Amino acid sequence: MTGVQTCALPISLELDVDGYRIRDDESFDQHDFLRRVKESVKGPKSSCPSPEEYMQAFEGEADHVYVVTLSGKLSGSYNSAVLAVNLYNEEHEDCGKQIYVFNSRSASIGETLIGMKVQEFEESGLSFDEVVKQTEEYISSMNTFFVLETLDTLRKAGRLSNLKAFVASTLNIKPVMGSTDEGSIQQLGQARGIKRALAKMVEDVVAATKDCEHRILAISHCNCPERAQYVKACLEKLARFKKIVIVDTAGISSMYANDGGIIIAV
């Protein structure tokens, strides 16, 4: 189908480190953020976009609008976006604009992969309903995995007891984490030392992906490009993917992954 144009319009979340507010947009300074997090006692917090911010983004010439949010189990972004769609439709009953909100049930690079699929389907000439249907099927087939260098952020966010975090840190135990079908976080396993944990994660990724040669795999790293390249090399030894891409984490992803964290979505 010719003449179809698509564009991505990021809607920023806001991060807060001990009262210092940071927008998760192109101005995000990862190194400064990680320094502030390391020095913080309480740890970072985040706030999702308001319905009004989403509604402002809906304005424009596009007849088809697709929103991809953080997992509804991890953030209020999905509920805020759904509310925004309902409010917008009430105020613009006859505008002819079709809007759909995808709950990524993932985070970080997982959202990016979903956005890429939406663009692929839309530019292929599929109808709005068919784009939604096929993208939802893609989301259901996706998996997200991650390994953290430190448990500090999870501890400060109340996800771990101080004792569990202390024991894991003392024994150099690194958990291998992943997403559930609903988009929550679960522990898949653990290993002593970061390299063993990364190797375990790679094995889990390959075991969970039945059609590797047809899928794009994405690696997102927080300030550790060499580690990301190591993971890529390990994956290529075990399976052949359609493509493997590596990107650095942005704001909210840097908050959850913390310095040295690795996230995989496929």
What is each of the regions a protein language model found here?
Residues A8-E53:
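N-terminal glycine-rich anion-binding loop in soluble enzyme alpha/beta folds
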Residues M1-C7:
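Single conserved hydrophobic/aromatic residue that forms the stacking wall/gate
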Residues A8-D16, Y20, H64, L74-S77, ...:
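Mixed-charge interfacial surface used for oligomerization/domain docking
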Residues S50-E59, A84-L87:
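Short, charged beta->alpha transition segments
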Residues S71:
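Short, glycine/charge-rich beta-strand/loop segments that flank catalytic centers
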Residues R36, E90-D94:
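Short, conserved catalytic or adaptor-binding loops enriched in Gly and charged residues
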